[in-house]
Amino acid sequence: MIRTRHVFLFAVLLAFASSQTPTPEAKSSEQSLEENKFFPLPPTTPFPTNAVAATDEDGEELCTSDKTIIEKLLNNYKSFRTPSESGVIVWIEVWVQEVNSVNEITSDFDMDIYVTELWMDSALRYEHLNPCKYNLSLNSEILDQIWKPNTVFINSKSANIHKSPFKNVFLMIYPNGTVWVNYRVQVKGPCSMDFSAFPMDQQSCHLTLESFSYNNQEVDMQWMNWTTPLSLLKKEIVLPDFVMSNYSTSLKHEIYPAGVWNELTMTFVFSRRYGWYIFQAYIPTYLTIFISWISFCLGPKMIPARTMLGVNSLLALTFQFGNIMRNLPRVSYVKALDVWMLVCLTFVFCSLLELAIIGSMGARSENRQAQQQKQQDEEATKHQKGRENSTCSHLMSPSSCPNSPRICRNHIPNDVPQSFKSYGSTDPRMRKRLIIASSSTISHAPNANRSEKVLLLDGLEETQFSQVETKFSSMASIKMKKHWTTEEIDRLSMIMFPGLFTLFNIIYWTYYLTVNT
């Protein structure tokens, strides 16, 4: 009986000694805990513990329940005291769940995000209490009873923790005192709107996190450095008007009168999806411009039809421009769409200006033709009256003619050369024949007495003046031939307008499609 008792006591002592001897796994666990005392592990890494559950006489493990651990941790806990006198490091991570909207009118964006905070609180260590679990998952009621870094979105317009159906706050405490807090927040932040390249623009939106109550001497806020501090829960975030093209994080130190604060900034870049504007603005303006060029093919006689095409094109462009611009904020600088519309309006206006030039030239040409026709009719009438009033005979002597040789131009004797007989003719074509005659011909005219010579010399004076007048008229006709006709201007416009518009398109699309990249 006594021997049996000694064997039992030896077994108990052996079991106790083996339980107190640390295994290699336990040693590594202790070393891991010491290494992560101030730099917590990622939340996905299970926190080991060196606590070994004791057993009762029946062989059942004895561990401390979560309720008991919480009661002991919160007993005499001071929530207003920072976890460390030398300051605490708070690690931040953000997961983007969804972007709800990007508003150009109010210059902001709305999104749902998960905000993760990690810090060490030595007052919440419970590994020595032999816990039944390696972590404690608690609700927001316990979070209100412990110390928090009071993280805020310092530049947000609004921020609310989701309540669907309860407050979306997650709290986990690890045995080494690591506190992991996660919020699901709907936040509205500002955007730096720049519409210079609209609708090929990119907009940048920012959210800044910082501790509202503690400067960086007490709370040193940092982005998580062992994982991606900012990530998307979706592969791609696409909105009706925008797509998230880039996102990044940054850290800067902001100086306030109360000290220096660490500001953690998230930057989101949204690129506009301009397909809607291609179909609603650019393609209709292309068609309007092409329609305005049809007037060049109608000819200078179709002034009313060409005017209708030009005016309707101008009104259509103005309506399209106003319909698109009314949904955008009023800015004082020129946008890419403004450049497009103004240039298109300029092309349509220039087509109307070309039409005005064609119409003016056509009207002047018609007036000139009417005056020439009227002048020809008057000359024909005078010629007819001169024939009827001619009463002198071609065979009369010179003495029977009047004293003034200008009145008796048709009364030249038959022996005068034929080139001089036409002097008195009112036909302009016949009058030009006097240019052939010279003074020597006149002086040697047969049977020409003094009166006849006076008559012919008088005719020579008018012939010389007529020759000078004919030279000037021929020079004027040469100059008139150098002027553009309406048909030539239309043909030139059919080449210049499409060519200049094509050049503008190359410059426009090359610049605005590459300005953001």
Curated annotation (Swiss-Prot):
Which loops or segments lie on the Extracellular side of the membrane, by the record?
20-277, 325-338, 516-517
Which is one Gene Ontology cellular component term of this protein? Answer: chloride channel complex
Cytoplasmic topology ranges: 299-304, 360-494
Query: Which residue stretches does the UniProt record annotate as biased composition, category Basic and acidic residues?
Result: 375-388
Give the highest taxon in the source lineage.
Eukaryota
Disrupted-gene phenotype:
Grossly normal movement.
Q: Which residues are glycosylated?
A: 135, 176, 225, 246
Membrane topology reported for the UniProt record: Multi-pass membrane protein
Principal localisation = membrane
Its family remark reads: Belongs to the ligand-gated ion channel (TC 1.A.9) family.
Name of the protein in question: Acetylcholine-gated chloride channel subunit acc-3
Query: Its encoding gene is what?
Result: acc-3
